[in-house]
Each structure stands twice: as C-alpha cells, then as structure tokens.
C-alpha cells in the first residue's frame, strides 16, 4: 500500500521537470540544458532509494505480526508438603508442639529444634537451572526461603503430619514452541532432608521471637488447612474418574465370557503365540511406561472430559491423539481395537471346534491359561498446562501439588 501511495504522489512531480525543461530550453543554451538534466537525474536517483526504505518499513510489522510473538503469562505455582511429626527425635518434636500450645512465650527450646529440607525442580522443559527452595521447619512455624524472598508459614497439624503450603508466581514467556513441549513435560520435585544442601544463609539462620508474629503475606493455619482440603477433594475426584474407567472396562468383559476364555485348551495358546505377540507388544510397552510414571494416571486439567481407555495403543498413536484437534483419530483407534478383538474371538472359536479339549481338572489346575486382559487407564483432559507431578504425590488438578514425605523406620 505504501508503494502505490508513493507512486501516486510522485506522478505530478515527474511531470513538472518536463515543463520546466522545455521553457528553460527556449531561453538557454544546450550545455546549460545538459547540466540541468544531470542535476534532475541525480535528484531522481536519490528519490528512487526512498520507496525501498518505505517498502522495508512496511514489511517489518507484517513479518513481526506473522511471526511467533511471545506472551508473558503469570503462573501461580502452589506446593503443599506433609512432614511427619515424630521422626528421628524420639517424641521430642511432638512434646515441644504441646509445650508451645500451653506456653507460647517459652520459645527458647522451640527455636533450637529445627529440621532442614531442600527442594529442586525444573518448572519448564528448557530450564537449565532448577528452581530451589529451602525450608526450615520448627515445631510451630516454618520458614520458606524462595528466590523472591522469605515466607513465614504456620503449619497445619493433622494427626502425625504437619502440612506446609506456599505459593510462587512465575512470569512465563509463552511461545508456540513452549506449548508443544509442555504437553509432554513432567515436573519432578526432588527433596533432601540434609543440611549440606542448604545455603549458608539458611544454615546459620536463627529464629527470633518476631518470627512467631504475623508477617505480611504469611500463610496461617486456616489458609493451609483450606488449601490442603481443597487439593484432597480434587485428588479424590481424579481417583473416582479412574475407578469409573476400570469399572467400565470390567463390564466389557463380563464373568461369563471370562469363564469361557479360561476353558480354552492350552494347545490353543501354543498355536496362536505368533498372533498375540505382535498385538501385545505395544500394550506391554505402554504398560511399562505407565509403571515408570509416579502416578497411575496422567491427566491434563482445566476442562473435564470423559476418560478413555487406550490400552494396546502405541506411544506414537497417543502423541498423535494429543496433537490432533478432532476426535476422529480416537474413534479410529477404538474401532481398530474392537475389530482386532472380534477377529481373534471368531478365529479362536473356529479352531476350538477342530481340536481336542482338555479335561476340566487340568484346565482349572493350569494357571497359565489366557485370562482377562488388564485394562490400564489413560485419562486425557484438554488444557495448556499438564499436571505437575512429583516423586510421592496424589493426582490433583490445576497447578497444585500434594507431596507426602515418607516416615523413616
């Protein structure tokens, strides 16, 4: 558009030199006319360079508009940890808690009893340095040392566990490449209970009396309790969804059909080893990958969608299913699995009639006969951010994480 506008503006200007040249030619000599033409040619050459610059300037915003422009998105990351109360102190930690409840002013012994915890995790796939958090846990207060500052948290004691929760806000630069990588990214939270991993500032930190007072932005017991109960409710909903999937998969294989499959002779299994081996390789690889995960299900939270069993599907098919915009690939995978199961059942029935059957006593005593297949749940919920899972965690939704610290014997 800028190029056409420039040509339209310069059309009258290109006519003006011609009229001036003719009038000047009548009154001057030929040499003066040649000098005048050379001067005009130089002026036109200098003007011809300007449209290129205008074209370049006009093309720059178009290229930036079509390119992958990053967007800064604030992300709130909330962590809730449950620490055991009676761990390694022979009941001293619990007795100090009861002592502080009765006499809050006597805090000299309470400040000396502290435990050290160091946490590291990679928030984004391309992070080179992990996010680090240091925790000093006292009987009635916890100090959380973040990169942005120090937070005071009042733990919520539930039985023999002390819950500590805090929030961190990260400004993430979101691009198309990051959205592609983050769908397959899993956050692994690593935790150490050693003093060597702590920074020098935290290692020699001494809790003062002011540490028990209410700080600005501190997490109180009621807030920690509300946050933990909310996370627990979300995790129970996720467990119920997986149980529904398992019940539906069991209904697809009723007990009557299972008994019929158990009565198949052992010779049938030997003659058909080549057929199920190829189809079961993908399911075995997928089950191994699920066992390596920390939780039994992988969930993407934000929109609640019905969960679907994908046992027997390869990892490439699952990735294609996640990246696809429609559900056509999902229906194709399910139809393919059903057709394979029906074809194998019909072939098995035909070959059973041709072969001799085993005695019932041998079939009941033989534990290697083919039984019902194990149905593994793979629940998918469309969202931008995946579930943030740790080493010891309960499945939950949103950007929340529940981690249980195991007790030592």
UniProtKB/Swiss-Prot annotation:
Organism lineage: Eukaryota, Metazoa, Chordata, Craniata, Vertebrata
Skewed-composition ranges (Low complexity): 51-67
InterPro entries named in the record: DUF4550 (IPR027876)
Basic and acidic residues: compositionally biased ranges: 36-50, 245-265, 282-294, 338-350
Region (Disordered): 36-67, 239-298, 338-373
A matching Pfam family: DUF4550
Species, as recorded: Homo sapiens
Designated name of the protein: Uncharacterized protein CFAP92
Biased composition (Polar residues): 268-281
């Amino acid at each position: 558009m800028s190029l056409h506008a420039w040509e339209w503006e310069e059309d009258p200007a290109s006519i003006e030199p011609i009229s001036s040249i003719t009038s000047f030619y009548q009154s001057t000599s030929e040499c003066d006319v040649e000098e005048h033409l050379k001067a005009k040619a130089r002026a036109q050459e200098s003007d011809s360079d300007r449209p290129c610059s205008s074209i370049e300037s006009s093309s720059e915003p178009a290229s930036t508009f079509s390119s992958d422009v990053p967007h800064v998105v604030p992300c709130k990351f909330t962590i809730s940890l449950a620490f055991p109360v009676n761990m390694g102190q022979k009941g001293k930690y619990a007795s100090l808690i009861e002592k502080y409840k009765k006499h809050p002013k006597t805090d000299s012994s309470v400040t000396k009893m502290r435990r050290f915890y160091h946490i590291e995790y990679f928030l984004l796939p391309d992070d080179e340095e992990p996010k680090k958090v240091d925790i000093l846990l006292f009987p009635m207060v916890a100090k959380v040392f973040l990169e942005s500052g120090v937070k005071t948290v009042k733990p919520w004691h539930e039985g023999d566990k002390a819950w500590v929760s805090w929030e961190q806000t990260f400004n993430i630069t979101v691009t198309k490449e990051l959205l592609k990588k983050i769908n397959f990214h899993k956050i692994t939270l690593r935790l150490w209970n050693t003093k060597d991993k702590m920074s020098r500032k935290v290692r020699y930190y001494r809790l003062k009396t002011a540490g028990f007072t209410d700080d600005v932005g501190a997490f109180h017991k009621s807030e920690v309790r509300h946050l933990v109960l909310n996370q627990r409710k979300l995790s129970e909903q996720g467990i119920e969804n997986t149980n529904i999937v398992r019940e539906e998969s069991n209904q697809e294989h009723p007990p009557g059909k299972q008994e019929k499959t158990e009565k198949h002779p052992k010779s049938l299994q030997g003659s058909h080893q080549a057929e199920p081996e190829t189809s079961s390789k993908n399911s075995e690889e997928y089950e191994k990958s699920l066992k390596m995960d920390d939780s039994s299900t992988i969930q993407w939270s934000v929109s609640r969608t019905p969960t679907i069993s994908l046992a027997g599907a390869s990892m490439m098919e699952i990735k294609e299913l996640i990246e696809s915009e429609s559900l056509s690939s999902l229906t194709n995978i399910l139809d393919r699995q059903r057709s394979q199961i029906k074809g194998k059942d019909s072939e098995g029935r035909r070959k059973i009639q041709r072969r001799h059957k085993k005695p019932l006593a041998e079939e009941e005593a033989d534990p290697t006969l083919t039984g019902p297949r194990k149905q593994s749940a793979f629940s998918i919920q469309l969202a931008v951010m995946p579930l943030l899972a740790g080493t010891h965690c309960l499945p939950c939704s949103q950007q929340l994480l529940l981690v249980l610290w195991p007790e030592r014997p």
